[in-house]
């Protein structure tokens, strides 16, 4: 995952597409970061924390004010009782939480099962730890996992089952039945479940279901989330892990040698964010849902086939109806032809499995509506 076919360091497709956006003046819908700041209450809390002197190393597990806020959040939204002192760890974003978890809980040769396509860090982290990466396909157009394929993939060799729900890049939200099957298989094969839930508040329709709330799951589930997507603070890199005490202690043992600690003035600010009223959380989902609908409709009008996402930041569109069977090639010409940047889904798929996703493109709708309207207008050039 880290090296190209020539053995050299491989630049990410995200870096390549962002560079194309700059060189062509195209609208960058390739990367999943918002273009608006989060709530003023959070920004002011960060400014105040800096003024108040929270500028040195915070505690290794995170500042108590944030750990308490995370615990209260889990109880408030999901009815989960989480000990802030023994079951909560603050990390440098969800990605560090994932890295510390995978490196702490796997040995070389262990198997880690993920859905595919997958967030690109998954494969890299699994590879760094020497584990074997096993995938279960999410196929177009519905991007739902097949139960029989889950049963075949999860075996006595499986150490971790890593699921991202809501799912990046497809926007799929896994059903309760699918999550219950995963818990059943984890229990049968004595595997741990790692859930990446960074889009937990960005679900359209049915409420988010944390795996840890399901019967029999709590004692074997490591839940990872972050503030960046919920509060438009992706640059602050404040994430967290919640897990049973013995498991969390193992994760902390690795995490302390990654970043050690991070983000002291941002931690109390995110604590403020987690305590915002329900209206804030329902409002951000409703606003993002409108943006999803705006971009999805524009992509359909431009000639793409679109799978409507159920959560998260992204929509997947098929460029085949426009005459492009190779999304990587399409994404390299689209900035010049249409003035918009997307990312090929093949960037989220292992080399040997890319043919099945060859014509699919991911677009981000976590932008200002005026930017999305401009992008939709530009995409009209593809019809001509």
Which functions belong to the PLM regions below?
Residues 2-93, 100, 149, 275-276, ...:
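N-terminal small-domain helix-loop-helix segment of the aminotransferase-like
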Residues 24, 129, 188-189, 302, ...:
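Helix C-cap/helix->beta junction micro-motif
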Residues 102-126:
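Conserved PLP-anchoring active-site segment centered on the Schiff-base-forming lysine
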Residues 127-134:
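A short helix-loop-beta submotif of the ANL/AMP-binding
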Residues 134, 138-205:
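Active-site phosphate-binding strand-loop segment of PLP-dependent enzymes
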Residues 152, 333-343, 347-384:
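PLP-dependent enzyme catalytic core of the Aspartate aminotransferase-like
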Residues 219-289, 296-298, 302, 383:
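Conserved core segment of the aminotransferase class I/II
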Residues 271, 288-296, 306-319, 356-357:
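Conserved glycine-rich beta-strand-loop-beta hairpin in the small C-terminal domain of fold type I
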């Amino acid at each position: 995952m880290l090296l190209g076919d020539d053995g050299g360091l491989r630049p990410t497709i995200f870096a390549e597409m962002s560079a194309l956006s700059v060189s062509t003046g195209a609208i960058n819908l390739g990367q999943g970061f918002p273009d608006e700041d989060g709530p003023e209450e959070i920004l002011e809390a960060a400014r105040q924390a800096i003024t108040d002197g929270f500028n040195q190393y915070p505690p290794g597990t995170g500042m108590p004010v944030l750990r308490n806020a995370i615990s209260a959040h889990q109880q408030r939204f999901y009815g989960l009782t989480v000990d802030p002192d023994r079951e909560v760890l603050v990390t440098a974003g969800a990605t560090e939480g994932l890295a510390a978890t995978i490196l702490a809980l796997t040995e070389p040769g262990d198997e880690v099962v993920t859905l595919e396509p997958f967030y690109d860090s998954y494969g890299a982290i699994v590879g760094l730890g020497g584990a074997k990466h096993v995938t279960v396909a999410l196929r177009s157009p519905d991007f739902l996992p097949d139960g029989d394929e889950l049963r075949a993939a999860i075996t006595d060799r499986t150490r971790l089952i890593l699921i991202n729900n809501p799912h990046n890049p497809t926007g799929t939200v896994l059903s309760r039945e699918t999550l219950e099957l995963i818990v059943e298989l984890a229990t049968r094969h004595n595997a741990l479940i790692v859930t990446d839930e960074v889009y937990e508040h960005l679900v359209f329709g049915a409420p988010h279901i944390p795996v840890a709330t399901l019967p029999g799951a709590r004692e074997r589930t490591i839940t990872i989330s972050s503030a960046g997507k919920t509060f438009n603070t992706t640059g602050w890199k404040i994430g967290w892990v919640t897990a049973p005490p013995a498991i969390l202690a193992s994760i902390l043992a690795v995490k302390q040698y990654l970043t050690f600690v991070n983000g002291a003035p941002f931690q109390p600010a995110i604590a403020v964010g987690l305590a915002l009223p329900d209206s804030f959380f329902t409002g951000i989902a409703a606003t993002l849902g409108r943006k999803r609908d705006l971009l999805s409709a524009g992509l359909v009008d431009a000639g793409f086939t679109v799978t409507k996402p159920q959560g998260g930041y992204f929509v997947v569109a098929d460029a085949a109806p426009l005459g492009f069977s190779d999304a990587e090639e399409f994404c390299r010409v689209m900035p010049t032809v249409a003035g918009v940047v997307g990312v090929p889904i093949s960037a989220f798929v292992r080399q040997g499995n890319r043919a099945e996703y060859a014509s699919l493109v991911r677009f981000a709708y976590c932008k200002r509506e005026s930017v999305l309207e401009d992008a939709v207008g530009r995409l009209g050039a593809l019809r001509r």
